[in-house]
UniProtKB/Swiss-Prot annotation:
This is Pentatricopeptide repeat-containing protein At2g17033. Coiled coil: none annotated. Signal peptide: none annotated. SUPFAM superfamilies: SMR domain-like. Gene3D superfamilies: 3.30.1370.110, Tetratricopeptide repeat domain. It holds the Pfam family PPR. It comes from Arabidopsis thaliana. Transmembrane segments: none annotated.
Amino acid sequence: MAALIQTIHGGVVVTRTLTLVYPSTFTSRHKALNQMTSSSNSGLRRFLFTPPQRLSQGICYWGAELSNNVSWTYKTKMVVRSKAGAVPLMKHGDRFLSSLSSPALAGDPSAINRHIKKFVAASPKSVALNVLSHLLSDQTSHPHLSFFALSLYSEITEASWFDWNPKLIAELIALLNKQERFDESETLLSTAVSRLKSNERDFTLFLCNLVESNSKQGSIQGFSEASFRLREIIQRSSSVYVKTQAYKSMVSGLCNMDQPHDAERVIEEMRMEKIKPGLFEYKSVLYGYGRLGLFDDMNRVVHRMGTEGHKIDTVCSNMVLSSYGAHDALPQMGSWLQKLKGFNVPFSIRTYNSVLNSCPTIISMLKDLDSCPVSLSELRTFLNEDEALLVHELTQSSVLDEAIEWNAVEGKLDLHGMHLSSSYLILLQWMDETRLRFSEEKCVIPAEIVVVSGSGKHSNVRGESPVKALVKKIMVRTGSPMRIDRKNVGSFIAKGKTVKEWLCK
């Protein structure tokens, strides 16, 4: 059963969905609230500032008393995250997870456990931990298999190379909370507390990981309990380091839970405790507002950062761009790119990715590589005013120069880290730039010209690189002499003089 939570932020109504999972016997006796309205002073603050109770004891939430038959999972319809993706899988681990999904193992817990045991026994430490980390990630590409993370971890603990890792435990506890396996998460938590409670710093860092992991997984109960433990430490600790780390995690966690207003209150509390908020806290709040589309609040935080001596850097500027892009605010994105010149903030590959992934014309063009423009001048004729400004600002930056190596031996363009749209624009820029260099009388002509596209090891489908397909298609359509390198299938190569003849003909 779902409840709608509406919060008003600066005139913008943000609606979230809170899912309440009831057994049928419980729903026959209780009616859930279909709609809940909370101000920025309520909601998660109840969890943060009052002692939480285990579900077995009952939870009172916004006046609704819930018995031990109710479980909580936090979901939002407005998650606009700057996704780095799940932990990349090694090839061996990818094969293992594929086999774990096979029909032969379906519905047979004993067979699955034997399969997991065999995998851990036959795998090196790096591979086994890689698979576990992938399953624990809130961005995992195998969410249907994350249920087996605990079984995998249990087998790993039996390995001779196993070292107890509190960060890994925090991530596993958070996943179990998300899956509403509270007895199992409580067992792991109790063990961790027993091992770490004698060392205040280690225990605090564990709780910090627990707060952030629960917030990423969307577990209200796990987040509130870990936050309450951190508050207890803040109240009794005399260590500035311990208090700072605790506050940082609470700010980050609240922003992950779409509560940037409450996160700002924590920052104010830091000031009262004579602890100076750092750039990390401000970035968290800035992006928390931004991904919710609360741009007035986002810009207010940007201004405050400047007045307090925190320099706007590339990471911060990319957060702003990502926020605008997620809400199709292209005019604001263009204005922000122009402001960055005044801040002397350099662009990065991620700047390209954030901006170009938000340009609908370019994204649409790249769906048909047989008809997309193959020159920068041609591309500009298809763009609307907003997109044309964005492309202009990007092409005036130094990102292309940083992606190029140029000497007598080799002239190389490296497209690693670039999304398809960024690779497209950079490639068009590169052709113009290379042509310009070749036209100079004193230009050094490299023996070889190389374009590195990658072979698809990090693509959504292993071995299928959209960037490689893009480069190949454009090379064919423009009559380029560059061909796939036999020694490196993730690169295109040709003699420098041949490339000069092609571009300067």
